[in-house]
C-alpha cells in the first residue's frame, strides 16, 4: 500500500470549537505537526491550515465540518493525490470514548464531514482513522447528537480520548510507511 500523502484532521475553526468532541481530528493533526516539527499555516487556496513535511501534507480545513470536502479536494487535486493516499481523522459516535478504528472506504455513518469529502472526491475510497467520542445515548446523556459533538468531553471521557490520540501517534511510523495492516493491528489491539 502507498504511504498517505495527505493527512486531514476534521474539525471546526475558531476558539469556541477548539476543545469540542467534533474537533478530535484537529487535535490529532496538531499533535502530529508537533511530533514532525512542522507548523500549520493558513493556505487560502486549500481552504485550511496546512503544513508539508517531505511528500506528506497535513491539513485542517477551515471551511467548517460540513464543507470539509472543499479543502480536501482542493489540496488533493492540486497535488494529484489519489483517494487511497488520503487519511482522514475524525470523531466517531459509534465507538466509545478512546476507541480507535482504521479502515479504508465505506459509508459515512451520518458524519457530514465525511459525506462532503466523499461527494467532492467522487469516491469513498480514502482511509479513515476513527476516534471514538461515544454517543450521548450510550453514555446515558440526554443531549441531542448535534449538542453532544459541539461540547467538550466530560472529565471522565477526556483521558480515554487523549490516550487514543497518543496510541495513534505511536502508530504514525507504520502509517507513514504505508503499513496500514500493521497500523490496524497495533491500533485495534488491546490498549497499553
UniProtKB/Swiss-Prot annotation:
InterPro entries given in the database record: Pept_tRNA_hydro, Pept_tRNA_hydro_CS, Pept_tRNA_hydro_sf
Keywords for this protein: Cytoplasm, Hydrolase, RNA-binding, tRNA-binding
CDD domains (alphabetical): PTH (cd00462)
Coiled coil, from the record: none
UniProt keyword annotation of Hydrolase present: yes
Gene Ontology CC terms: cytoplasm
Enzyme category, top tier: hydrolase
UniProt family annotation: Belongs to the PTH family.
Protein name: Peptidyl-tRNA hydrolase
Species: Dechloromonas aromatica (strain RCB)
Amino acid at each position: 500500500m502507498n504511504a498517505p500523502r495527505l493527512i486531514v484532521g476534521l474539525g471546526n475553526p475558531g476558539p469556541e470549537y477548539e476543545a469540542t468532541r467534533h474537533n478530535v481530528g484537529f487535535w490529532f493533526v496538531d499533535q502530529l505537526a508537533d511530533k514532525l516539527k512542522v507548523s500549520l499555516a493558513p493556505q487560502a487556496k486549500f481552504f485550511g491550515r496546512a503544513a508539508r513535511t517531505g511528500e506528506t501534507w497535513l491539513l485542517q480545513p477551515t471551511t467548517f465540518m460540513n464543507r470539509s470536502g472543499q479543502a480536501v479536494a482542493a489540496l488533493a487535486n492540486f497535488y494529484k493525490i489519489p483517494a487511497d493516499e488520503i487519511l482522514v481523522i475524525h470523531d466517531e459516535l459509534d465507538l466509545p470514548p478512546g476507541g480507535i478504528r482504521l479502515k479504508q472506504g465505506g459509508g459515512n455513518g451520518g458524519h457530514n464531514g465525511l459525506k462532503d469529502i466523499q461527494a467532492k472526491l467522487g469516491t469513498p475510497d480514502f482511509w479513515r482513522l476513527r476516534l471514538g467520542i461515544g454517543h450521548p445515548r450510550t453514555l446515558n446523556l440526554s443531549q441531542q447528537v448535534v449538542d453532544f459533538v459541539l461540547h467538550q468531553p466530560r472529565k471522565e471521557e477526556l483521558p480515554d480520548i487523549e490516550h487514543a490520540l497518543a496510541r495513534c501517534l505511536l502508530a504514525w511510523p507504520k502509517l507513514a510507511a504505508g503499513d496500514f495492516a500493521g497500523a490496524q493491528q497495533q491500533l485495534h489491539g488491546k490498549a497499553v
